[in-house]
Amino acid sequence: MAKDLDELLDEVETKFCRLDPLRLDLGERPKGDGGGGSHSGDRNGAQEKETLRSTETFKKEDDLDSLINEIFEEPDFDRKSFQKFKSKSSSNTCVRAPMQGVSKSCSPVYLSGSAIPCGIGTNTSQRACDRLRCVACDFRIVSYNDYMWDKSCDYLFFRNNMPEFHKLKTKLIEKKGARAYACQCSWRTVEELTDLQTDHQLRWVCGKH
């Protein structure tokens, strides 16, 4: 592939960077005997040479396009590598693409009542994680501020109704300061800041922010 690219660059340099002999020929027309000659004949000759020069230029461009197409049509040709190579050869200025945002996880992971704001939890910034996911049922955890779960909730209720709020609200009871959490297999009502690691029955993790 590197050999093909080198040949392509050599072809461009040979055909487009060298001096055009026809252009030189136009600038060095021989003088007639005694310095005379027909002006109309000179104009006709110049027009013919200009037409020939244009024809040769088009032929060179067609040959170059054909060479590029042949390289593109090879089965092992890597277009991305070619574009990268062409970009580097056309300019010495490197433009760095903006870095994508790096995902962050809570450490430790906190649950809390509605009085605690949600966000990325750390030892110094105690916030409730709002990107929780259950590794048991592979559901994202939903939470409802100022609600608690009714004591009659069971596994089948969440299994059949998650994550539709209009179905879940039949088991939600208003309670100021509480926050009701649930996935398809587990549920909790939390009022105080709680480290998730202290609840060994829950298989919830931070799904990254």
UniProtKB/Swiss-Prot annotation:
> Which Gene Ontology cellular-component terms appear in the entry?
cytoplasm; photoreceptor inner segment
Keyword terms: Cytoplasm
Task: List the InterPro entries.
Answer: CFAP418 (IPR029239)
Q: Where is this region: Disordered?
A: 24-58
- Which cysteines are disulphide-bonded? none
Tissue and organ expression note? Expressed in multiple tissues, including the brain, kidney, lung, spleen, heart, trachea and testis. Expressed in the retina (at protein level).
Q: Which stretches are tagged as biased composition: Basic and acidic residues? A: 40-58
Q: Where is this protein localized, as stated in its record?
A: Cytoplasm; Photoreceptor inner segment
The task this protein performs is described as: May be involved in photoreceptor outer segment disk morphogenesis.
Whom does it interact with, and what assembly results? Interacts (via N-terminus) with FAM161A (via central region); the interaction is direct.
> Any idea what this protein is called?
Cilia- and flagella-associated protein 418
Which species is this record about?
Mus musculus (Mouse)
